Amino acid sequence: VDSKFATNRTVYFCYSKAANDKTGGSGNSTALASARLSDDGKTLEDVNVLFSQQPKYRSALHFGCRIVENPDGTLFLGLGDRSHRMQDAQTLHNHHGKIVRIRKDGSVPPDNPYVKTQGALPEIWSIGHRNIQGAVRGNNGGLWIHEHGPQGGDEINRIEPGKNYGWPVITYGEQYG
């Protein structure tokens, strides 16, 4: 829920968004939306999609989707690598295996670390993540995440802007199989 929920009744949620078949695309992505909870608490109103992970990919795995409101009012969103696209976590031209930071209207803050990096998606905050399962803001305002690793490779990390957290190049787990 939004930090000002008592007055604005805004909630944030993620869902699996299908590709628009009219464009010939396929697959799905993690999408982040905001909505206002009705006064009777029974419906969501004014639903607005703030973000949709790119590229879409046909998979039912590693969506991520942990939302944390930053003290400055921006939103952090943890995104999984979609399992079969693990190498994407090391690049800046897609959202797989990333944490992104956006404003509550979906726009990109100008102080994000990759805003001025050619070829990078400007909403990216950090890279090299597998599948973020938990996220919380610490007492000092920092972002902490729990990442589901392969066979014994779970991690807890304090997230910093522009940092690479290693997946899949560095892991303490073992591949399945």
Residue ranges of predicted features:
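Acidic, Gly/Ser/Thr-rich repeat motifs that build Ca2+-stabilized beta-propeller blades
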Residues: V1-M86, G134-R137, G141-G149
